[in-house]
Structures are given as structure tokens and as C-alpha cells.
Amino acid sequence: MQNKEYDIAIVGGGIVGLATAFQLQKNFPKLNLVVFEKEKELAFHQTGRNSGVIHSGLYYKTGSFKAKNCVEGRKQLVKFAKENNLNYDICGKIVVAINEEESKRLDQLKINGEQNGLVGLKLLTPEEFQKIEPNVDGVKALWVPESGIIDYKGITNKFADKVKSINSESLIITDCEVKDYKENQIKTSKGIYKSKHIIFCGGLFADRLAAKDKVKLEMQIVGFRGDYYELSEKAKSKINNLVYPVPNPEFPFLGVHFTRMTNGDIECGPNAVFTFKREGYSKTAFNLKDTLQALSFSGTRKLFINHWKFGLNEYNRDFSKSLFLKELQKMIPSLEMHDI
């Protein structure tokens, strides 16, 4: 057992865990913190496997915590990146309607974004948005100038550096899984640590960590995997920045879109398929406990029953490059199979 007692222990070394650690350490420099990350490096799961988009706050219900946190978080994130010379670009994005039904939803999306405090939103005709993205087709688009791209893994590691530079007594421990905790003792794969307080930032295992702490939740995490293709070197010129479809309001997914990464690559995706392993990143990834827990949850069954057709289409696209391409061609008709 470690003899030292820490003021706060944070479980989870993704961007949420390290942002929490950084803010606490910045505001209370004398606090002794310890961060536990079960993988060998920080930002290994969701933080390091997303498309790197800085979302503006366009989609979320006005007045919700999601809307408020997205807008304020974006401002803080950009400020931090600028102050620390980190790689980011507020390049803006267009949301493209491909038919009249989507055009009406796009009008409402603009109103929603303005109510959330976004500035510079502008509806564009095809002639106008093709000056931004010449290869994109559609009936109307929404210009969102406050969206951008960033390296979230780099941000997370910079948070870690800042924590250690403010207080050298604070620790960030990787390859260290939290097994159990009781009162002020935390049992890990690297021994027992003592802490006055514990903050859980456990990503896809947040619900299980809460259950260990005897928190009764009505909700449960159900894993969905998103797969991406990359545009070929030759096809990269067909996209300048970020191009999104108008999202279907029935689902929490934004649809297959195009994203320029900070390294210049162009990603196309993702789809959204139920995964049989929470932290599974391949089509064959499987974990019995994760699968049984997800399928026994009433929310999962309700989702499958109500939206089986959507789910089936996503799985078909998951195993068919031609179907994936067909979805991408709705916005960029000139794309061909060899482009992805």
C-alpha cells in the first residue's frame, strides 16, 4: 500500500479525466492528484479514436447541458490549444441537404444553432456552397464557421504535462487498472492507493464503475462502433474541410460525413453498428459479458425493435464497400470505388 494519501484520485486517462485533472490542478495548485489509466498510454480509447472535430454546439437542444457545455467547452478548448501552440484549425463546415425534406430540417437547425449562441451561421445556395466545396452536390447547405479540427490525443497529453508541471507531487499512472475501492482505499493492478475523494471518468465503463459505487442507474452504456474509410491521395482534393449531411432527428448519430484531419488525411464515415465488445474496434471483436449485458438491457431491445431497418442497413454497409460508397456519393457524386 502507498503510504501517501492523495487529495483526489481520477479514474480514467482520456480527455475528460485529464481535463478534469488539469482544471483542478490549475485552480488548486497544492492539491495532490493521482490519475489511473488502465491502458499503456493516455487517450487510448474514445479520445484517440474519434474524427478530431471541434463541434460548435449546432445540434443540441437549446438550454440543455449538452448545448451549454459544447459551446463553452469549444471556447475553452480553442483557447487552450492557442495558448499552448497545439495543432488545430477553425476551418468551418457545411451541412448539406440533398432534398427538400432535409432542406426544411436545415432551416430548423440554423434556428437551433442561433438559439445556442452560435454566430455566423448562413444558409447557402448550391452556387454559394460550391465555392467552398466545389465537388459537393445538394439543394442547400448551412455554413457553420465555428466548427474545426484538432488533435484530441495531443490535447490530452498536454493536459497531463500541465498537471505535472504545476505540482510535481501529482501522479499520472498508466497500465494501472482500478479493481475495487472501499472508503479511501483504491485497489489497482499496481497496488493500493489512498485518496480522500475519487472522480470517475471511465468512458465506456462509466456505468460499471458507478455500479461498483452502489449507484443505481436507469440507463446503461450500449456500445456502437463506427468505421471509416480514407480518401486516396488523389481523391483528397475533392474535399477541403468538413462536410456533413443533415442528421436524422430520430437517431443520436450525425450520419456519414467527410472530415479533414489535422495531418491532412480525409476520413469518410462513420457508420453506426452495434458492437459485441465495448472497446472492440474490429468487425469480429467479441466479449461475452458486454454482449449479454447489452442484450439484456430493455433499452437495447427497444432500440432494435423500433429501428431494426436502420440497424440492418448499417450492418449491410459495414460489410459492403459499394454500399458505403453509395452513401458518400449522395453528397459527392463524383467519388469512385478507387477513391476510398
Annotate each PLM feature.
Residues K216-E218, A235-K236, M261-I340:
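Flavin-binding catalytic cores
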Residues A43-G73, K82-Y88, F274-F310:
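Glycine-rich active-site loop/strand segments that organize a redox cofactor
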Residues Q2-V16, V34:
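Beta1/beta-strand and adjacent pyrophosphate-binding region of the FAD-binding site
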Residues A19, Y181, T188-N287:
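Flavin-dependent oxidoreductases
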Residues Q25-R49:
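Glycine-rich FAD pyrophosphate-binding loop
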Residues G52-E128, G138, G255-V256, K277:
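Dinucleotide-binding Rossmann-like beta1-alpha1 core, especially the glycine-rich loop
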Residues L142-H197, C201-R208:
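Helical element adjacent to the flavin cofactor pocket in flavoenzyme catalytic cores
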Residues K61-E72, V96-L106, L142-D161, N313-L323:
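Short beta-strand to alpha-helix junction loop
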